Amino acid sequence: VDTGREQAKRVVRNGKKETTTLPLCWTAGANTVVSDQDQEPIRIWILTCWWFLTVGILLGSWWAYHELGWGGWWFWDPVENASFMPWVLATACIHSVILPLLHSWTLFLNIVTFLCCVLGTFSIRSGLLASVHSFATDDTRGIFLWWFFLLMTGISMILFYQMKQQASVRRTYKKEMVVARSTLVHLRHSARAQPRPVMLWKN
């Protein structure tokens, strides 16, 4: 288990900056990220992914406005929405990782952001969405992406469930330790406060 955690950390530190796979890899080893030294690379990766996605959306809008001459920057096209959904989720991830503690919904946001990117790629490349941005000519090309999406969804949900179980065990253990420590403190003070016989003379 420790080897897998260290591998997840190395992927976060040494991976490519332009992919949402890095936050997902961090999610796989998120139960080890407890210090500020480990959380700082996470913030950098998520911000970098968010900036790349933002620049991509802006360049796509500029290209559509100047090259296609539609007379507007944004038309809520299905393909535009497919890129906008991961951007909204990535924005939520940025706000969630600012907190000093790791929460289950932070892990869930990272998982859903990556899965939305895969699902958006599948929708565009398979021709499932009818859009002027879609240049798919072969519907069978999306089969691989669909199976990859299902596989990653299953693995991510299993990891998320295991992490939630580990987090609940740690919270229960901490509560039990607090109660036990408080009980010991009360017993110690009670022992000190017990009446003791007073010696009026010495033998």
UniProtKB/Swiss-Prot annotation:
Protein's membrane topology: Multi-pass membrane protein
One MF annotation (Gene Ontology) recorded for this entry: heme transmembrane transporter activity
InterPro entries, alphabetized: Cyt_c_assembly, Cyt_c_biogenesis, Cyt_c_biogenesis_plant
Keywords on record: Cytochrome c-type biogenesis, Membrane, Mitochondrion, Mitochondrion inner membrane, Transmembrane, Transmembrane helix
Keyword match Nucleus: no
Positions of disulphide bridges: none
Highest taxon, organism lineage: Eukaryota
Compartment(s) where it occurs, according to its Swiss-Prot or TrEMBL record: Mitochondrion inner membrane
One Gene Ontology term, aspect cellular component: mitochondrial inner membrane
A Pfam family reported for this protein in Swiss-Prot or TrEMBL: Cytochrom_C_asm
One annotated GO biological process: cytochrome complex assembly
Keyword Transmembrane helix listed: yes
Residue ranges crossing the lipid bilayer per the database entry: 44-64, 143-163
Subunit annotation: Interacts with CCMFC, CCMFN1, CCMH and CYTC-1.
Other noteworthy facts: A stretch of 270 kb of the mitochondrial genome is duplicated within the centromere of chromosome 2 resulting in the duplication of the gene. The expression of this duplicated gene (At2g07768) is not demonstrated. It is also probably not RNA edited and therefore differs in all the positions known to be edited.
Function description: Forms a complex with CCMFC, CCMFN1 and CCMH that performs the assembly of heme with c-type apocytochromes in mitochondria.
Family as reported in the entry's similarity comment: Belongs to the CcmF/CycK/Ccl1/NrfE/CcsA family.
The protein's name in its UniProt record: Cytochrome c biogenesis CcmF N-terminal-like mitochondrial protein 2
Organism: Arabidopsis thaliana
Encoding gene (name): CCMFN2
